[in-house]
């Protein structure tokens, strides 16, 4: 009875506050429901992600010995919602806000998967490689990203972002990201055992995706560019051996280097379309050939 009376008293006080300060109450509610967009919140989320993987879970390293060769293609999943401040005049998540969500998701992927890039103590021994030939402190730098929007995300709707390594070439490593409905991965896993038709599975997967994105990263050792394959081998994520390995997390790893290469080639076919966008930089040379329609500042013609 004491707890019930306390709840009733608390409710009455809350109601009185709302009636006395309605606009302040609305402001507090809007702020709390949009705390994701508070000043410096993006920086806080990024720092927390880096601290968690680099300090709290520093020794939790992804290697072939633990996760098998398929560990390189493992997903990182982050969850979020689309608060009021992220919605545009059309009443759904604004296109520009997808990129800030991708920043947080990808920093989780990079600091989880590529821990050995910046910390030599987390890399496996490579007795066949001379110490002077091994890259020292590698950085993983963003080179470009592109989003393809499929379906809108409603205000305050929940969604997940799934990201993994897609492929790599002589310079770039490509990461694919999907904005999907919560629980989509579990649903797809259960449906794979029930639905045998590949076309039907593709349609089901497509129906769960709000937006897809592709990003390219480059590995740098000082000013020197490190080939992605060399960087992955250096961090123990890629092996030239074809033998089957016993892993501590996934049991027997049935993935061979040939299968990894097959998956890479499949991914690079998709990445080729993204690579072709680099030719856009050359098109600015034609700027003088077209009419000038106006110049505007932050508030139109005022500033």
Curated annotation (Swiss-Prot):
<keyword id="KW-0808">Transferase</keyword>
<dbReference type="InterPro" id="IPR051490">
    <property type="entry name" value="THEM6_lcsJ_thioesterase"/>
</dbReference>
<dbReference type="InterPro" id="IPR029069">
    <property type="entry name" value="HotDog_dom_sf"/>
</dbReference>
<dbReference type="Pfam" id="PF13279">
    <property type="entry name" value="4HBT_2"/>
</dbReference>
<comment type="function">
    <text>Thioesterase; part of the gene cluster that mediates the biosynthesis of oxaleimides, cytotoxic compounds containing an unusual disubstituted succinimide moiety. The first step of the pathway is provided by the HR-PKS poxF that serves in a new mode of collaborative biosynthesis with the PKS-NRPS poxE, by providing the olefin containing amino acid substrate via the synthesis of an ACP-bound dec-4-enoate.</text>
</comment>
<comment type="pathway">
    <text>Secondary metabolite biosynthesis.</text>
</comment>
<dbReference type="GO" id="GO:0016740">
    <property type="term" value="F:transferase activity"/>
</dbReference>
<protein>
    <recommendedName>
        <fullName>Thioesterase poxG</fullName>
        <ecNumber>2.3.1.-</ecNumber>
    </recommendedName>
</protein>
<comment type="similarity">
    <text>Belongs to the lcsJ thioesterase family.</text>
</comment>
């Amino acid at each position: 009875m004491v707890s019930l009376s306390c709840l009733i008293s608390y409710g009455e006080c809350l109601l009185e506050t709302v009636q006395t300060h309605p606009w302040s109450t609305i402001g507090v509610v809007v702020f709390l429901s949009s705390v994701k967009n508070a000043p410096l919140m993006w920086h806080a989320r990024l720092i927390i992600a880096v601290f968690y993987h680099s300090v709290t879970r520093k020794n939790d390293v992804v290697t072939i010995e633990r996760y098998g060769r398929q560990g390189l293609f493992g997903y990182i999943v982050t969850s979020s919602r689309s608060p009021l401040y992220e919605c545009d005049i059309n009443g759904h998540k604004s296109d520009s806000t997808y990129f800030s969500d991708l920043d947080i998701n990808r920093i989780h992927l990079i600091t989880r998967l590529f821990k050995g890039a910046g910390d030599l103590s987390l890399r496996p021994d490579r007795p066949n490689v001379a110490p002077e030939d091994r890259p020292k402190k590698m950085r993983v730098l963003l080179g470009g990203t592109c989003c393809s929007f499929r379906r809108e995300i409603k205000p305050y709707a929940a969604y997940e972002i799934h990201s993994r390594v897609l492929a790599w070439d002589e310079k770039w490593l490509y990461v694919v990201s999907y904005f999907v409905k919560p629980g989509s991965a579990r649903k797809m896993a259960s449906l794979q055992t029930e639905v045998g038709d590949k076309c039907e599975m593709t349609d089901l997967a497509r129906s769960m995706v709000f937006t897809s994105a592709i990003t390219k990263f480059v590995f740098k050792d000082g000013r020197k560019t490190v080939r992605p394959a060399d960087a992955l081998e250096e961090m123990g994520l890629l092996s030239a051996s074809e033998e089957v390995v016993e892993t501590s997390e996934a049991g027997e790893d049935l993935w061979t280097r040939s299968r990894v290469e097959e998956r890479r080639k499949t991914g690079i076919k998709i990445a080729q379309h993204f690579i072709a966008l680099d030719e856009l930089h050359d098109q600015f040379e034609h700027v003088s050939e077209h009419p000038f329609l106006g110049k505007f500042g932050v508030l139109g013609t005022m500033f």
